[in-house]
Every structure is written in C-alpha cells, then in structure tokens.
C-alpha cells in the first residue's frame, strides 16, 4: 500500500509536524507491505525520540526522495526492509469489499494476493502512480480513511477537552469585543438593542478591524494549555464581507468593525489533544427584523440537525436537509455543505464522511465516534452573512423501537459558546427548541466556569440566561 495524504501518514505513524500552515503534518510518504513499513521523510526533521519510536516499532525511515525509486522496487516485489516483521502467512487473501466499505459502485468482494498494490486513486500523485503497472494496482479508497475517522476513547476525550478550553477563549474574546465596541464606537453592546451613539462613534481614535480583532482572538487561544496554532486562517468578517462564505481579511484592505452591522467569525485552533472549529454570528447594535429572522432560521436548522436520530448505515447526505428546512420555508438556502469531518490534532477538514446536499461516491455512513461539524448559514450579497457552527460526535442512542435491528445514532455537542439571544426571534421557536437552547446554555455556564474569571463569568451568565417560550 502506498500512502500519500499527509494526514494519513501522520495518523498511521502517530507523528506530527509543522511543514504545512495550520495543519500539524510533515512532508512525507509511507509504504506498507504485508511484513514491512517504510516512512519517507527528511531525516533531519526527526528527533532522537521519534527515531527510537520508529525503530522500536519496526518502521524503516528512508530519505524523502527515495520514495520514487522504492515504488519501482515495490512494483517488482523487490522492496525489502531490514526490519521486516516475521510470522505473516505467505500470499494471504484479503476481502477488500468487506475491509474497505468504500461506498463505490463495485461492492463485491475482491480477493488478491500480496503482489497487488493498494493505491487510493483520489489521493495518490501521478508521479508515483505512473510507475505502477495497471494490472498490479488495486484502486480503492484508502483503508486508513475510516479508522482515522473513528476516534478512539483517548482522541474523543482530547477533542472534548480541547473544545472546552477553546470555548473559554471564545467567551473571553466576546467579553473583550463587547467592551471595545461600546467604548470605541458607542455600541449598545452584545445584550442591548439600540442604535449606536454616533457622536461617540466619531470621537474614538483607535479602530477595530477584521484583522486586529481576529489577532486578539488568537491571543486568547494562545494562552490556553496545549495550544499549537490555528487550525485554519480565521474568517473575521463584518457586514457585506460576511456574505462571502470563505472570506479572509487582509490587513491592508480589511474592513473596520461597525456596531450597526453583523459580525461573523469562523475560527479554530490546533491543540495537542484536539482540533477545534467554531462559528458564531453577533451584532453589537440593533439588528434588523430580517437579520434576526434569518439568524433564527439558521439556528433552528442547526438545532434540528444536532438533535437528529437516525439508523445505522445512513450517510450524512440524508441528514443535510434537516439543517435547511427552516430556511427553505422562507425561500432561503446556502451554497455550501452543512458538515465536514474534523481531525484529532490533524486537519480541520478530513474524510471520509460529511453532511452535504451533494452526495459523494467516497462518502461513508456516519458511525459511532466520528466527529463532524453542524454549520448551516445564510448569505445575502452586499448585505450580511450568518453562520453557526458546532462540532458533534456521533454516538449510540436509545429509541423506543429498533426497526430492522439496525440500531440508532444521534449526536453529542462538544462545542461550548453562547448563541446571541438578541439575534433570535423567540416567537418562532417551538418549545422543544427553547428547552434545548436553555439546556445548552446551562451546560456552557457549568463547563466553562473553571476557565473564566469573575467578570467573564458574570458576562457569560447574562449571555446564557434562560429564554422564556
């Protein structure tokens, strides 16, 4: 098997690096045979501890540039490791159909002997693929994709802890930003609905920009235990810029914050114990009725998906509409997927599952211990944009019945930060949504309390006060 995706190589050998911005991976390849394992990397990047780990586990470290010639040797059955593992059955037969569960059109089992080379056609670079004979290639989705997506108990615990610390950083950021918007711009603030004080808005000498405030958010995250950097470049967007789904501000051209406009921030971090991703949309002035109703529709879809119960074997594609239906009722929608997979101190986007309106041949059913985001939105060109995002863990759930003996699944939220109440039209929420929102906010107070000081906790208590149905 030839492994080329950097996150799969990192996961396979349990190594991390810093060769790629925002992704803790190292430029490397891997080749795994029935009795050998090879790691192709710049050897100067490896610490003595990593070298010892590789040696103890029978992994042969080779120079990064050797992978090309070694693939040629692999194709002719001449690639041999000095630390080959003994005791394997010669020429074993492997049931690929059951082993990979790729979801491809060909679902029948394929038997092969160990001179076939497993290559993921959706990931392998042509430079290596071209060195192989077509009749010796098994073109299947990588067998590492699914086990990497199925988080083990240590990874799940790490993700939960990382999201708690990250949630505390987001709350600290909102507390700081709320104060700054009031002091510098005369904004009514996070809680009050009123027009900004124009006179005070004009008097301020210091300005807040999309870049300067996102830098401050990074400062709060950097103060947290195990922080190693951002997991992607922060989307910090105000007003019409928030309508650009993948907007990335530049210091020279970014907008200044405006208390009379929506502010959307989509951000995340890399911690040693987990990767985070969160989006919140806020307003520090008086939101329009249209902004409030749009945000409420997005929130209703977010809650609906997060509360879904579904049978084993269901792909995320089948759940996507749950997040869109509240928007569809108004004739609104959004042009991106609703949920992406997330790594464990790895890529913030990874495979092989997703929640999207568009089905994918490589998509696999949602399974217990997978991590996925829940992030519906709405974007109105030249006006505003809204997105709300939490990370979810797939878990088993108890249902009154069990049709088909399939077993049923649900989601567990692991992201903790308040939803702005003044952007919510409570009159269109059903009692179940109000109950969920109040329970979620109560958990925010309980879970984040140990990480906040007195003033920050007072702010959070106010931000999470129960909503009356």
Residue ranges and their predicted role:
Residues 1-469:
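Active-site neighborhoods and metal-handling regions in enzymes and metal-associated proteins
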């Amino acid at each position: 098997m030839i492994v080329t995706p950097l996150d799969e190589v990192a996961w396979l050998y349990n190594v991390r690096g810093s060769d790629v911005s925002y992704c803790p991976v190292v430029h490397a390849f891997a080749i795994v045979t029935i009795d050998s394992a090879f790691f192709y990397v710049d050897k100067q990047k490896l610490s003595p501890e990593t070298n010892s780990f590789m040696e103890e586990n029978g992994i042969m470290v080779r120079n990064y540039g050797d992978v090309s010639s070694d693939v040629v040797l692999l194709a002719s059955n001449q690639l041999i490791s000095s630390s080959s593992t003994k005791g394997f059955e010669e020429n074993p037969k492997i049931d690929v159909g059951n082993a990979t569960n790729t979801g491809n059109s060909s679902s029948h089992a394929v038997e092969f002997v160990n001179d076939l080379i497993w290559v993921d056609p959706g990931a392998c670079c042509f430079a290596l693929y071209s060195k192989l004979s077509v009749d010796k290639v098994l073109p299947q989705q990588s067998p590492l994709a699914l086990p990497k997506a199925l988080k083990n108990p240590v990874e799940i615990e790490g993700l939960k802890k990382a999201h708690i610390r990250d949630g505390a950083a987001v709350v600290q950021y909102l507390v700081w930003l709320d104060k700054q918007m009031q002091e510098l711009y005369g904004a009514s603030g996070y809680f009050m609905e009123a027009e900004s004080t124009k006179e005070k808005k004009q008097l301020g000498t210091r300005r807040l920009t999309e870049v300067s405030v996102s830098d401050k958010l990074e400062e709060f995250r950097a103060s947290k235990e195990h922080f190693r950097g951002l997991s992607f470049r922060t989307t910090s967007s105000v007003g019409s810029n928030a309508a650009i789904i993948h907007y990335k501000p530049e210091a020279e051209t970014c907008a200044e914050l405006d208390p009379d406009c929506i502010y959307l921030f989509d951000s995340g971090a890399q911690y040693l114990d987990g990767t985070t991703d969160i989006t919140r949309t806020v307003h520090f002035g008086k939101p329009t009725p249209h902004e409030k109703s749009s945000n409420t529709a997005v929130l209703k879809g977010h809650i609906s998906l997060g509360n879904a119960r579904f049978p084993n074997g269901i792909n995320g594609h089948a759940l996507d509409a749950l997040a869109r239906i509240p928007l569809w009722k108004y004739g609104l929608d959004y042009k991106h997927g609703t949920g992406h997979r997330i790594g464990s101190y790895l890529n913030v986007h990874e495979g092989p599952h997703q929640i999207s309106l568009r089905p994918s041949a490589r998509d696999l059913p949602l399974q217990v211990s997978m991590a996925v985001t829940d992030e519906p939105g709405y974007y109105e060109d030249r006006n505003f944009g809204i997105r709300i995002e939490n990370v979810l863990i797939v878990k088993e759930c108890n249902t009154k019945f069990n049709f088909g003996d399939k077993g049923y699944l649900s989601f567990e939220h692991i992201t903790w930060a308040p939803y702005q109440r003044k952007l919510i039209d409570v009159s269109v929420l059903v009692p179940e949504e109000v109950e969920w929102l109040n329970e979620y906010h109560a958990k925010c107070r309980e879970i984040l309390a140990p990480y906040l000081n007195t003033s920050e906790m007072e702010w959070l208590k106010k931000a999470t006060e129960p909503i009356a149905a």
